[in-house]
Amino acid sequence: SAETEKEMANMKEEFEKTKESLAKAEAKRKELEEKMVALMQEKNDLQLQVQAEADSLADAEERQDLIKTKIQLEAKIKEVTERAEDEEEINAELTAKKRKLEDECSELKKDIDDLELTLAKVEKEKHATENKVKNLTEEMAGLDETIAKLTKEKKALQEAHQQTLDDLQAEEDKVNTLTKAKTKLEQQVDDLEGSLEQEKKIRMDLERAKRKLEGDLKLAQETSMDIENDKQQLDEKLKKLEFMTNLQSKIEDEQALMTNLQRIEELEEEIEAERASRAKAEKQRSDLSRELEEISERLEEAGGATSAQIEMNKKREAEFEKMRRDLEEATLQHEATAAALRKKHADSVAELGEQIDNLQRVKQKLEKEKSELKMEIDDLAGNMETVSKAKGNLEKMCRTLEDQLSEVKTKEEEHQRLINELSAQKARLHTESGEFSRQLDEKDAMVSQLSRGGQAFTQQIEGLKRQLEEETKAKSALAHALQSSRRDCDLLREQYEEEQEAKAELQRAMSKANSEVSQWRTKCETDAIQRTEELEEAKKKLAQRLQDAEEHVEAVNSKCASLEKTKQRLQNEAEDLMIDVERSNATCARMDKKQRNFDKVLAEWKHKYEETQAELEASQKESRSLSTEVFKVKNAYEESLDHLETLKRENKNLQQEISDLTEQIAESAKHIHELEKVKKQIDQEKSELQAALEEAEGSLEHEEGKILRIQLELNQVKSEIDRKIAEKDEEIDQLKRNHLRVVESMQSTLDAEIRSRNDALRIKKKMEGDLNEMEIQLNHANRQAAEAIKNLRNTQGILKDTQLHLDDAVRGQDDHKEQLAMVERRANLMQAEIEELRASLEQTERSRRVADQDLLDASERVQLLHTQNTSLINTKKKLETDISQIQGEMEDIVQEARNAEEKAKKAITDAAMMAEELKKEQDTSAHLERMKKNMEQTVKDLQQRLDEAEQLALKGGKKQIQKLEARVKELENEVESEQKRNVEAVKGLRKHERRVKELTYQTEEDRKNVLRLQDLVDKLQSKVKAYKRQAEEAEEQSNINLSKFRKLQHELEEAEERADIAESQVNKLRVKSRDVHSKVISEE
């Protein structure tokens, strides 16, 4: 097209213009090149003259400098070789130590495997005991069901007794005459009941004392049982005096109620005993965990501990079997008593009709019982003697308790003396630590003074160096001038070569442009329409190239102008250099003298610096030794503090025991005082009984006349009895409801107790699982600690290397002083940590020695040692793989620690729930006590009514009285058998309670051990992290020192190369100077 042709024409014109400009530039360039050649020849002549004169001066100076640098470098090379040899020796020692540690690790791993096997056995035994505990809880649930059945039967009996009471209440109006005598007897019965309750309280106190003083408590129990038997005999005699079979039946009912209430109380006590047994169980579990820790430290003792645990488990199994047998016997006894009570109920219903006939026979027995009462009074005197004997026994108990109190006080005084001694040791250690800190401060002050002196020396050396530099400036000015002239020459040569290269590049560009133009022409002719856009781009590129060419031409012109200027400047400088050469010859002689004097001063200052450096090192060693002593003192102080804490705990325990003993003594004194009161009351009762007997004789004669009237009034009473029976039925219904409520509340408390037991068992299983996990974590942590110790030893070797490199850096370079101070601080910190680790290592080595001695004693382990020697090679490979796995295991340990924390939180929430349940149980027990008091009040009301009814019934027939007396005797025998069975059942239940308390205590101790292990794992993790950080810092420092060493080595090699090049140049310049000198002589 036309446009492309125009553009091509324009391009051709521009190309021709550029060709012309290039031709002009080439012509100018040729002229400049010719001028440059002439100038270069002149310059070379001048340089040869200047170099010939200046080289003679520079050669001597360079030789001196090179000799000094060579000596210094040789000394450094020697030091580096010596360090390398020391490092090799250290590496060899470390490899030997590593092998020893690997051997020890393999032995410890095998011991740990043995311990794990024993732990697995112990866990199996624990599971077996837990299953036994579950079986016992099921049996307890069965017993609770039987108790519920017995309560139901008791309600039925109460209903029957209430019916009989309703029948008797019909005759209340007819027995007003005997109320006075009966009220007196009731007062006596109430007093005896109060004494009985006091005796029960005393018995409970004695049972508490039984846990600490079993022998004394047995005697007290025997005396209390004798007193109870005496009281029962007194009750029986008082019942005979009353001559009322209905009263006797009512008393038996009351006794049944009281026994049931006692059973409720005993069940509550059993629940408390089970809680105590749980606490004991947790204690035992904590003891077992402690034994496991001791097993990990002493391998041989672990075997003995496991055998002892197996024996303990066997004993526990035997105890559980005994408890099962006791429970089965108790259930059989309860069933037998239930059947007997049913029979009694049937017999009592049949015999109620015959009671009216028996009442008439009472009159004849009254005269017989008159003589019997006198005998009973004599028996009461005998009982008083037995009470006095019991008092003597209790006084003996008090004496023994006082002796124990005195012993406890002596122990307390000993502990107090120990505490005072420990406090004195603590004060002494404080003073020693203060002295050590003061000595450390003094040493630090010495070090600071020495460092200041060193800084002053370095400042003086720097001042001398400045003087040298100022004096050598004049000397070096000439050398710089010569070097600048040489550099200018080199620059001119380089510029000339660059211009030639630029010319060649322009020619190449021109040829490329021509070829591209021809190509574009051919392409334009063929593809003119299609390639318009490509032509435009090519046009732009050509325009840019033309601009670049123009700029290059301008740059060449500017260089030519600068070359002319440099030519004139060089001519002026050559004239100045000739003058300076003459001056430098004069100053050389002066500088030689000054340099000799300066060398002497330098040698003196170097000697002083070395002395100060030696003093510094000695002070550092002293400070390190002092720091180690301070660390040891701190360890001793911490140990003394731990001992103090243990003594304080023991003191607290002793104080608690003393308080318990004082309470027991006070309670025993109260008991003695109460017994004296009882004695006085019995004397009063004796006199009152005699008076009552006389009144009863008079009243009986008066009542014989009234018996006839009573028979007439009986018919009237029957109608009233029917009316009252309906009222009593309503009261019975109310009592039934109250009893049902009580039974339901008891059942709910028992269900809650069973749930708490199941929860405790679940928690126990969880804690055992957590224990196993924590033991595994401990093993991992021990392995990591061993590896950290190895890394620390490696860091010790690296530390020594870094210390040597730092010393070299201090001598060689002033710039690295600040880095040296930082490194020294780090080194001190590392050394302190290393010393701590050494202390821990020494402790581990002591434990290892103990284990080795135990291993030598054990014949079985000797055979294992032979197999261990063969497996050491395999364990070495395993250790290398374990190192790679440790990081993963650390993450697992962290995760497990978090899981353990969550489990601990759950356990805390469970404990809070248990506390709430305990509060609920306490509330229910308080409610039961209130119910008990209400029941006692109702019983007293019923007794009053019974007494009145009995007074009315005295006017009945004698036959009924005889039958009722026989019935009363049978019931008394049955009651005695029932009481014996109840005592045996109570003993079995108390054993169960103790066992449950022990188990709960073991679970609590296990939870504490788990928390302690978790704290241990956290501490180990923090230590491992600190060791990792220290190792990384040491590696970084070693890498920095290695890089510095490599730089120094590289600089040394470069300096040697420069010295060789300088020597070769000096030789060349000498040859050239000789040639120039010979030419000058020939021209002259």
From Swiss-Prot:
GO terms for cellular component: myofibril; myosin complex; myosin filament; myosin II complex. One of its GO terms (molecular function) is microfilament motor activity. This is Myosin heavy chain, skeletal muscle. It is found in: Cytoplasm, Myofibril. The lineage of its organism: Eukaryota, Metazoa, Chordata, Craniata, Vertebrata. Pfam families: Myosin_tail_1. Keywords: Actin-binding, ATP-binding, Coiled coil, Cytoplasm, Motor protein, Muscle protein, Myosin, Nucleotide-binding, Thick filament. Residues 455-1084 form a coiled coil. GO terms for biological process: actin filament-based movement; muscle contraction. Muscle contraction.
